[in-house]
Amino acid sequence: MDPSAALHRRPAGGSLGAVSPALSGGQARRRKQPPRPADFKLQVIIIGSRGVGKTSLMERFTDDTFCEACKSTVGVDFKIKTVELRGKKIRLQIWDTAGQERFNSITSAYYRSAKGIILVYDITKKETFDDLPKWMKMIDKYASEDAELLLVGNKLDCETDREISRQQGEKFAQQITGMRFCEASAKDNFNVDEIFLKLVDDILKKMPLDVLRNELSNSILSLQPEPEIPPELPPPRPHVRCC
């Protein structure tokens, strides 16, 4: 996921001070320019019931890999990917949360700093769709009111086993102010990039112009260091988005 620095071996029999023939005669080796630093650092959290494919979506986007039998996430995990949108370089930190209820006290601490929230259900398992109101309560209780929301019906590759229609997903999203909806397949890599890039684009659209012009800004998009201990939970929000 994170790019690693390349390691160069010393030629056999050579020395650190040796000059290759190609560099003789006054020629100098050009130094490789360091990569441009990110203009913004931004956190996104993926939530949803166990087994809906949250980890698979994250790993497909960050590493372009897919695991048929991924182990359930314990607590939280994260990956980082740098993307470029609207002429800006964004370092995107994606938090993958456990779907089991016993981890809620841990994962809830990561909602507050998320500027985007991806809520995932499995189109082949009605119970994961029925759990969506529970996850919305978590969002309303812990997340920022300004967080962008995206509902994703995953496992579109299992169309023949579908239990939740696209219309049902769209109807649920329409009841939530500002929530977008799409269906995807981590296995077939369908709509995966679009999920994350559209979410980031929506976040950037809401940023003030003076913030967008300020490179390496310490604005509200700044990414905080990965906490070893979950941060203090924010107070409950004054109202909810849905019943």
Curated annotation (Swiss-Prot):
Keywords: Acetylation, Autophagy, Cytoplasmic vesicle, Endosome, Golgi apparatus, GTP-binding, Hydrolase, Lipoprotein, Lysosome, Magnesium, Membrane, Metal-binding, Nucleotide-binding, Phosphoprotein, Prenylation, Protein transport, Transport. Its EC number is 3.6.5.2. GTP binds at G51, V52, G53, K54, T55, S72, T73, G99, N154, K155, D157, S185, A186, K187. PROSITE patterns: RAB. Residues 1-36 are annotated as: Disordered. A motif (Switch 1) lies at residues 64-78. SUPFAM superfamilies: P-loop containing nucleoside triphosphate hydrolases. The modification Phosphoserine is found at S15, S20, S24, S105. One of its GO terms (molecular function) is GDP binding. SMART domains: RAB, RAN, RAS, RHO. Mg(2+) binds at T55, T73, D96. It holds the Pfam family Ras. It is found in: Recycling endosome membrane; Lysosome membrane; Golgi apparatus membrane; Cytoplasmic vesicle, Autophagosome. A motif (Switch 2) lies at residues 96-113. The modification N-acetylmethionine is found at M1. It is an enzyme of class 3 (hydrolase). It is a lipid-anchor. Regulated by guanine nucleotide exchange factors (GEFs) including DENND3 which promote the exchange of bound GDP for free GTP. Regulated by GTPase activating proteins (GAPs) which increase the GTP hydrolysis activity. Inhibited by GDP dissociation inhibitors (GDIs). A lipid is attached at C242, C243 (S-geranylgeranyl cysteine). Phosphorylation of Ser-105 in the switch II region by LRRK2 prevents the association of RAB regulatory proteins, including CHM, CHML and RAB GDP dissociation inhibitors GDI1 and GDI2. One of its GO terms (biological process) is protein transport. Belongs to the small GTPase superfamily. Rab family. The small GTPases Rab are key regulators of intracellular membrane trafficking, from the formation of transport vesicles to their fusion with membranes. Rabs cycle between an inactive GDP-bound form and an active GTP-bound form that is able to recruit to membranes different set of downstream effectors directly responsible for vesicle formation, movement, tethering and fusion. RAB12 may play a role in protein transport from recycling endosomes to lysosomes regulating, for instance, the degradation of the transferrin receptor. Involved in autophagy. Switch 1, switch 2 and the interswitch regions are characteristic of Rab GTPases and mediate the interactions with Rab downstream effectors. The switch regions undergo conformational changes upon nucleotide binding which drives interaction with specific sets of effector proteins, with most effectors only binding to GTP-bound Rab. This is Ras-related protein Rab-12.
